[in-house]
Amino acid sequence: MAELEKSVDHHVVLHELIHGDRLINGLDLSYRMLMKVAQLVAQYPGQVHPLLANHELSQMAGHPISKGGGEMTSRFEEGVDWVFGEHGPAVSMAIGEFIAAMPLALIGSNGVFCAHSLPGPSQMSRFDPEVINRRLSEDDYAPLLGSGWMMVWGRGQTAEQMEELARIWDISLFCLGHAFVENGIDMGGPRTILLNTDHDRAVVLPVSLVDPAPKVEEALFGALSLAAYGDLV
């Protein structure tokens, strides 16, 4: 869909790649998606951008996280061990290193900001906006307190808060995930789009990096249904 092979100026942004609802014998084998993305990163250097999300952070840090009534961190590890046997620990270590290399956000020169989420309103007094411009430390991943943790777990952002972050970071349009959006795309505020790509009404949003950032209304009508492209996995 992104036609990466046609131009080095074509990019694709990905997030929340693991802990799906397709289990095999009760095991989560979504490590395969990470491997597929890692292969694309190597094949198209500088064009494929996996961003850190709450499920990847939880897996890397060993924090329990639930989805669909099950504890996914353990299921993921059990899946890796089941497939790789005695090499499971080495594979898990490599997965952790890959996740640790994921940035929190991608910002286009036209002011389009892509991230899994942003801090909730109550977290702003403790949030360090410079976290997106520096190398992350272990403290940034700390539950509830780390600015990196806030970036992938925050919910319920307000318009006033988004305007403050837009001013600090010089952003025209925020593209976020994390929150469930029944129709695949919705407005999260005057300059915020919420996207879902993990259910039957999933959409993607093509954005030009050379033109001015689209307004929220333009983005709403510019989204494309993933169903039209069949099974891409």
Give the location of each predicted region.
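Feature recognizes metal-dependent phosphohydrolase scaffolds
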Residues: 1-233
